[in-house]
Amino acid sequence: MYVSADAIAKMAGTRRVHQLDSAAIRTDKSLGDEVGLKHIGVHLITIAPGDKSTEFHAHKYEDEAIYVLSGRGTEIVGETAQKIGPGDFIGFPAGGEPHETVNDGTEPLVCLVIGQRLAQDVVDYPRKGKRLYRNSGQRDMIDIREIAQR
């Protein structure tokens, strides 16, 4: 399957706000969906200055990666903040440290985000004390403290 640069430029994109963080706002063009990919997600995302890509999180089972196309920002992985810019590549192996991408620059931060699409995953949001269980389309968010109480 093929999608031209002109067609991608004309795609409207979807504004996404993370359910746990109203400052996690991005515009998403799902290139993988456009060409029928089922097992790999490929997204062209744009993060406005002052926004971030998502809530600080870590996947237990899915690998994820980011390639920066334009703009500048900061990638936070665990306790480490790394300045990022065009041409930089960041990989997040499954089971790794939590991360988030912040646009602390003055222009839109545009990235290609690539990740697995497994039927199930577990995603931790340590700053919010939440865990998401995803299984075959069902999504259940719980308070991490509930796990220790059971």
Predicted regions and their residues:
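Short acidic-glycine-tyrosine-enriched beta hairpin
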Residues: E79-A94
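Conserved short histidine dyad/triad with adjacent acidic residue
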Residues: I25-S30, H43-H59, A94-G96
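Short, conserved beta-strand element in jelly-roll/cupin
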Residues: L44-A48, A58-I76, I114-L118
